[in-house]
Curated annotation (Swiss-Prot):
Family membership noted in the UniProt record: Belongs to the UPF0421 family.
Top-level taxon of origin: Bacteria
Protein name: UPF0421 protein SAV1889
Organism of origin: Staphylococcus aureus (strain Mu50 / ATCC 700699)
Ranges in a coiled coil: none
Amino acid sequence: MNDQWYKHLIGARTIKTGIAIFLTAVFCMALDLTPIYAILTAVVTIEPTAKASLIKGYRRLPATVIGAGFAVLFTYLFGDQSPFTYALSATFTILFCTKLKLQVGTNVAVLTSLAMIPGIHDAYIFNFLSRTLTAIIGLVTSGLINFMVFPPKYYGQVEEKLSKTDALMYKLFYNRCQELILSRLQSDKSEKAYKNIFNLNNQVETLISYQRDELSYHKKKECDWKLLNQLTKRAYTNRLFITHLSNIIYLPKNTRVNFSGDEKMALLKISSSIKDIFYDGTFKREDDSVETLRSTIKALEISGENQIKSHILYEVLMIYRLLDSRYA
């Protein structure tokens, strides 16, 4: 806990950005170069992972060179007091970056291009080369800092978001079953809650991908990979749960489904046992209720009637099976 105190005060990424800016400025001043362009590059190069910094930095460098080149070209043609110089420099920089698939570097390329125009004067070649050099300094410094200083660890964030996802999933499943028991097949409230859970799980998967990238670029212990695999498996199960949950939320309009008393009781018991997982950490099996729903599905398959009802009960059993496997 003590080695992560900085995260509660300012954030590791913010600290790394500050260090990268400082060192970039030091290197540029030591070489008698204007540091502002290198600093712009350094700031945008700090990414969530070292891999992202390297990949995007590889594309930002040529984009910056393109921006500097157009700034010099149009300053030579129109001078640094013409609106055409600024407009054409920005336009052609964006155009070429897009055509060459260097979009990740477009922002810093345009900023560099526009910022350097007032200071070019007649030193066209010198300004072009110096801006290219400062961009390299910013990219390299920022990339190394991101790789070496405070390598990001997303385990805590992933576990926190997974726990939140679990709680919201179980609650929504319980509430949705209550709606189904009352024959409320359409529910804006459930749809809104589902979208929130879906977005939250996407955040989890993004953080997991970040952590996997970090582990591939740093030598880590086997326990780190083991923990990541456990979190990945848990997120995958949640993805399946969410998918099945969506299938009982988004139902055809103008559809009516009626459940018998035994079926309602089975839905109530299963949904209650799943909701209670968040409170006591255990999954209470409801074998009798499961068998009731299975019998109903078999009967509906034989008769070929009420496919929507069969579909709903099947999805409920699939969710039950997922959790039965997770807590086996």
